[in-house]
C-alpha cells in the first residue's frame, strides 16, 4: 500500500473516531457507534466456521453483519473492518463478505488490506498507542513489553492479543523477535489468564452469541410469514429477538397455509439477497 494512500486512510479513520465516545484510550462501544452513524447492525451467531461479517447496501440502508460466534475482540475488529469498507469502498461496490482470511490479514486483495488498515487506525491510533506506552508502561523503553502488558492494551483498546501485536509491530514498537517472544508467552499463560491477572475485560476473549436485529426488520419477517416464505416456528424465533409474541402482532398477520420449515439462519440469508 502506498504511503499516500495510508495517510488518506488514517485521516478518514481518525475523523470517524472523533465522532465516537472513547474512554482513556479506546472506543467504548463500537456496536452502539455503528448504530449512531446510521448503519443497520445485525449481530447473530451463524457458527464458528461461518463468515465473520459482511456489509451491503439494501435499498437506502447500509447493513452491517457480524457473527457473534467469534470472540468479542475479533467481532469488534470485524465491525471496524466492515466500517472501513463503508468509508473507503462502498460507493463503488454493493457488498463485501469477510472471512478469517480477509479479517486476519492473509488476503492479498487491496481493498481487504485497506479495510484492515482502517480498522487498526480506528481502534488503535498511533498517538494513543504512544500515550499508553508513555503513561502506563513505566519501563517500556528499557525492558519492552510483557504478555501482561499486552493484556492491558487489549482491555484499554478493546482489541485481541493478536491485533495488539500486529499494530505494535507495524508501528515499530516491537520487533519481529519480540513479537514471537510475546506470542510464546501468550501460548503458555493463555489470554484468559492474562486478562484475569491484570483485571482486564475477560469478555473480549469470549464469544457473546448475542442476537441483535434492527427493529424495523420485524416488518420484513412478518411480510415473509404472510407470503408463506417462513413457518410460524421461524416467526416465533424472530419475535423472541424483539421480546415479542405472536399475540403482540396478531393484527398484522394474514391467514395462511403451513409452509415448509425454514430456520432463522435462512431468514437472515434472505436479508442478504
Where are these regions (language model features)?
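Active-site hotspot residues in diverse enzymes, especially metal/ion-binding acidic/histidine motifs
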Residues: 1-273
Amino acid at each position: 500500500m502506498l504511503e499516500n494512500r495510508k495517510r488518506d486512510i488514517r485521516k478518514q479513520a481518525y475523523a470517524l473516531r472523533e465522532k465516537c465516545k472513547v474512554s482513556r484510550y479506546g472506543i467504548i462501544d463500537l456496536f452502539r457507534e455503528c448504530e449512531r452513524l446510521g448503519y443497520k447492525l445485525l449481530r447473530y451467531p451463524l457458527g464458528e466456521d461461518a463468515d465473520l461479517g459482511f456489509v451491503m447496501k439494501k435499498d437506502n440502508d447500509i447493513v452491517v453483519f457480524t457473527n457473534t460466534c467469534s470472540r468479542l475482540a475479533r467481532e469488534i475488529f470485524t465491525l471496524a473492518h466492515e466500517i472501513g469498507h463503508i468509508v473507503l469502498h462502498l460507493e463503488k461496490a454493493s457488498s463485501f463478505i469477510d472471512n478469517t482470511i480477509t479479517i486476519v490479514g492473509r488476503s492479498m486483495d487491496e481493498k481487504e488490506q485497506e479495510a484492515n488498515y482502517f480498522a487498526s487506525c480506528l481502534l488503535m491510533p498511533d498517538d494513543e498507542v504512544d500515550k499508553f506506552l508513555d503513561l502506563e508502561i513505566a519501563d517500556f523503553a528499557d525492558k519492552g513489553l510483557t504478555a501482561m502488558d499486552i493484556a492491558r492494551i487489549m482491555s484499554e483498546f478493546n482489541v485481541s492479543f493478536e491485533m495488539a501485536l500486529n499494530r505494535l509491530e507495524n508501528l515499530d514498537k516491537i520487533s519481529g523477535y519480540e513479537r514471537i517472544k510475546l506470542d510464546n508467552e501468550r501460548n503458555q499463560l493463555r489470554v484468559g489468564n492474562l486478562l484475569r491477572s491484570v483485571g482486564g475485560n475477560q469478555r473480549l476473549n469470549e464469544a457473546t452469541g448475542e442476537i441483535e436485529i434492527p427493529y424495523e426488520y420485524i416488518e420484513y419477517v412478518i411480510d415473509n410469514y404472510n407470503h408463506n416464505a417462513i413457518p410460524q416456528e421461524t416467526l416465533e424465533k424472530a419475535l423472541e429477538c424483539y421480546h415479542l409474541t405472536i399475540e403482540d402482532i396478531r393484527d398484522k398477520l394474514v391467514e395462511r397455509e403451513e409452509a415448509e420449515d425454514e430456520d432463522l439462519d435462512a431468514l437472515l440469508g434472505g436479508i442478504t439477497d
